[in-house]
Structure formats: C-alpha cells, structure tokens
Amino acid sequence: MRVVLIVDIVRQEEKLIAKALEENKVQYDIINVAQEPLPFNKALGRYDVAIIRPVSMYRALYSSAVLEAAGVHTINSSDVINVCGDKILTYSKLYREGIPIPDSIIALSAEAALKAYEQRGFPLIDKPPIGSWGRLVSLIRDVFEGKTIIEHRELMGNSALKAHIVQEYIQYKGRDIRCIAIGEELLGCYARNIPPNEWRANVALGGTPSNIEVDEKLKETVVKAVSIVHGEFVSIDILEHPNKGYVVNELNDVPEFKGFMVATNINVAQKLVEYIKENYSK
C-alpha cells in the first residue's frame, strides 16, 4: 500500500500523521499543493490512498477530485469536502434527516439579511457558509451592529461571504463540544471552554480543552451526523441547547486534533493510520 499526504501548510497534525505512517511502516509521499501541480494523468494512480489535509477548502476539494479521477481513494472524498466545507449544504443534509441544528435562516442578500434579523430577534449569530476558526462569525446585539456587519460583508469579493446564516445565539455552559470520528467509530469528544473576553470557544481563539464523558445521546447524534455526510475522518462541533439538547453546529472535513489529543490522550494520527491499514492495505 502506498499513501500520499496532501498538504498546503504543514501543521502539528500533518507532522503527527507523517510520523504515524513512518512508525507503521507505510510507504508514503507528501505533496504540497501550494508548490506542486497535480496532473490529470495516470501517474497519481500509483497511490492507493490520499489523506487530504490542505487548510484551504478549495485546495482540499480540488486535490481530492483530481486524485479520485486517477482512481485513488481519498480521505475525505471531494463530495464530503464539498458538503462539510459549506455550512448551508451541511445544514441542509442534517435538517432533512432530522438531526438537530441551531434554528437558522438563510439570507442571500443584504435586504434579506435585515429581514432575517427581524425574524430571528436579537441577540443573534450571523456567519457565512465558508470559513474556519470562528472567522467572520458575528454576535449581533442590535440592528445597528447588524447593518455594519452586512456592509462589511458586501465589500468582500467572494460571493459565498455575502451569504448569511442567521442563527439563534446559544449560550449554555460556557463551552462547545468537539468530537472526532474515523470511519464508523467515534474516537471521543472534549469540551472547548470559552476564554475570558470572548464568546467563541475555538481553540485557535484561546478556547481551553477539557475532557468530558460521552453519553449515549451525544454518541448517537454524532454518529448519525457523520453517516449522513459520509465522512471518513471528520470532527463534529456540538452545542448544548437548554431545551433541545445536543445540536450539530458544523462538521469539519480536514479536522484539527491537537486540542483533542491534549484533552483525551487519544493518538488520532495513529488511529487514522490503523484505520487505513485495516481497510485499504493491498
């Protein structure tokens, strides 16, 4: 079996994956798509599995698609990346299958966004369908703040950033929950605790990880959400609603896991390589 690790920025997670591949004596190459092209030819077909790890959604999506065209099994597939990389597409899949999500209104223009604010009521969350690390996710307390956010988003070149997901503001327990799944297995979950002077729990923004006990309802919600999007290696962000219980906030197709490892002591990279060897060895 030969594996290719696709990257654009080599973070701690990619170093851990490379180390796990070496320790498990798996042949592998690294292709940095920020520097190297991907040809549509049979050369890429020498790989059996591609681990897709670019930070950029579009680099991840397109590199996965090119490798799939060469007959390579990609983790994750371009279909999974396309759905998980766009929160509107994610919510559409989950809502159709009855998975709890935050109450959400989609607005595709500035005028529609103002109407969505009025329907939702303040405070509310407004975020675009694409993006990571809490970027451009706004807590809006009144219409004046809302108009400012809309004006700024209208100036952005990417049309997706002008789309608005208007949501209820769920502030409960001062944390959110991140879980990681590989294949059909839930590896575990941990809490991301909101830091001082912040309302978001992202580790990139200073959120601190802590271990939690996974109950059956949380496990059921996560496993079903993963199966709906056909994710093979994904993280799942969960909010705790005071009335609705666990709601799925988003799924990540190129999951970061250093905070998860600190909180749970689970070696995610090793688990990923074991999964690949068990399912795709030749």
Curated annotation (Swiss-Prot):
Pathway membership, UniProt: Amino-acid biosynthesis; L-arginine biosynthesis
Cofactor annotation: Mg(2+)
Binding positions for Mg(2+) 2 per the UniProt entry: E250, N252
EC assignment: 6.3.2.-
Binding site for substrate: R192, V203, A204, E256, F257, K258, G259, F260
Annotated family: Belongs to the RimK family. LysX subfamily.
The protein's name: Glutamate--LysW ligase ArgX
Source organism of the structure: Sulfurisphaera tokodaii (strain DSM 16993 / JCM 10545 / NBRC 100140 / 7)
Chain's gene name: argX
